[in-house]
Amino acid sequence: MHLNTLKPAEGAKKLAKRKGRGQGSGNGKMAGRGHKGQKSRSGGMPKIGFEGGQMPLQRRLPKVGFTSRKSAYAAEIRLDVLSSVDSDVIDLPALKAANLVSEKIKTVKVINSGEMKKAVKISGLKVTAGAKATIEAAGGSVEV
């Protein structure tokens, strides 16, 4: 066996249908497009969502909501995630160093979700009232 004698298995490489190349091919003349009409022409399909002149669904339904630009630079952190940070003082640089928030984040809010397992000092972060109570109950403190 040599590299120049290798061939694909029989039937492994199926030839593409050559449309519009004579009647003997079985796909000649109309090439499977039928007679006349928009869909028989080159580039002749109506745009996506077109409903034959009826007002399309995407225009009948009202616009709803928006994408908040605040979400690009603000983040929320749960209490159980904070317990995994090794630093005693938790601030924005400590969270970025622990890869809990991305580098583009500018403000972080600590929310009361999960359990606080150790006493930590939180500095320079927004904290909800419930989260503050849980942190102080665990022996930690909050500085704004």
From Swiss-Prot:
GO cellular component: cytosolic large ribosomal subunit
Entry keyword set: Ribonucleoprotein, Ribosomal protein, RNA-binding, rRNA-binding
UniProt keyword annotation of rRNA-binding present: yes
Name of a matching Pfam family: Ribosomal_L27A
Region annotation (Disordered) ranges: 1-54
Compositionally biased residues, Gly residues: 22-31
GO aspect biological process, one term: translation
Alphabetized InterPro entries for the sequence: Ribosomal_uL15, Ribosomal_uL15/eL18, Ribosomal_uL15/eL18_sf, Ribosomal_uL15_bac-type
MF term (GO), any: structural constituent of ribosome
PANTHER family: 50S RIBOSOMAL PROTEIN L15, LARGE RIBOSOMAL SUBUNIT PROTEIN UL15M
Family: Belongs to the universal ribosomal protein uL15 family.
HAMAP family cross-referenced by the UniProt entry: Ribosomal_uL15 (MF_01341)
Assembly notes: Part of the 50S ribosomal subunit.
Protein function: Binds to the 23S rRNA.
Protein name per its UniProtKB record: Large ribosomal subunit protein uL15
Gene name linked to the record: rplO
